[in-house]
């Protein structure tokens, strides 16, 4: 079965026609139906009137014709359904504004940001190409009062503190999981338009008034408490009046001028005294408050402070004892050098001979130096005296001679160069003489 529909417009006349072809086994029949012409002003349901076939053999196609007629009737009814009229442009875009506001509020709540009107204004305007106003939010509440909870608040916008509205979702709204806010708002908007056909615009619901920026309860209460405290602590300013005895003179103008000048001087002096007393009282209060704050310490804080103080005292005492011990050792070495100055000069000469014998060596064992010193003719010291003399030299001249332990062996190291120049014998003897002279002068 094949259906074909033809439409043509000629002189405001609509022509509708179709033909049905039935394919049978080995034969082809063509059924033609009559077509009625109607004016374009008539409804679409009357555009074509289908008549039943005159041939009785074509009775098989009657159900198909009935179904086609029913479809045409239902389509005409759908097109002729009356929709609620649009009242205003704000009503036309109110659904779009609601969707944009809902998206922005969800975004800001997801990132833990307070969705305020000043924050949503630019974003919603960018999404809808419409400038968002407070009246739009009030109209949304008129259509759906439970859609948002709008409360006044303070916020920082562009570096300034401003009063605005905060948007949030009501806590007591029990909505199912698969609930779409945009669909619900559209349904409520259509319902409102059907119920209020006579109104030309959606009325705006009254919102709470914005708080004033000048009213700050915290600062105001603290300021009141401060003023009451100053009134209670400050003394009353009393300006004493000095009574002057009248002078029995004929010049009354002179007497009046003197009286006025005296009263002005007295008032200025009393005012200056009161101001000074007030300043002293404030300084006394500040010092007493500092003392009270310093006294308010717990037992744990006091114990910690005491232990830290004791630690500092112990460290200072240990440092002083170590310094005294070092000074005593140095004095002992210097005393010994002063008594045995000649023998130490001979020992330095023997060491320089040892260094010249081994020009590439800087370190020697203690036994090696002691044996070389005993083999010399100019030295008549025992091994213990030689070892003690070398130890005293290492303490007196640490920049030239040092003693280190390598296991159980004492190793004596001599520095041949100081500051890029060779260490000379005369330089060492001069240092010894200066130390000995300083010790002798200090003892005398």
From Swiss-Prot:
UniProt PTM: Ubiquitinated by the DCX(DTL) complex, also named CRL4(CDT2) complex, leading to its degradation.
UniProt GO cellular component terms: chromatin; nuclear pre-replicative complex; nucleus
GO biological process: cell division; DNA replication checkpoint signaling; DNA replication preinitiation complex assembly; mitotic cell cycle; mitotic DNA replication initiation; mitotic pre-replicative complex assembly; regulation of DNA-templated DNA replication initiation
SMART domains: CDT1 (SM01075)
Pfam families, per database record: CDT1, CDT1_C
An example molecular function term from Gene Ontology annotations: DNA polymerase binding
The entry's keywords: Cell cycle, Cell division, Mitosis, Nucleus, Ubl conjugation
Gene3D superfamilies the UniProt entry points to: DNA replication factor Cdt1, C-terminal WH domain
Subcellular location as annotated: Nucleus
InterPro entries, per the entry: Cdt1 (IPR045173), Cdt1_C (IPR032054), Cdt1_C_WH_dom_sf (IPR038090), CDT1_Gemini-bd-like (IPR014939), WH_DNA-bd_sf (IPR036390)
Description of how the protein assembles with itself and partners: Interacts with cdc18.
Stated role: DNA replication licensing factor, required for pre-replication complex assembly. Faithful duplication of the genetic material requires 'once per cell cycle' DNA replication initiation and elongation. Central to this control is the tightly regulated formation of prereplicative complexes (preRCs) at future origins of DNA replication. Required for the recruitment of the MCM helicase complex to the replication origins.
Similarity comment text for this entry: Belongs to the Cdt1 family.
This protein's name: Cell division cycle protein cdt1
Species name: Schizosaccharomyces pombe (strain 972 / ATCC 24843)
UniProt gene name: cdt1
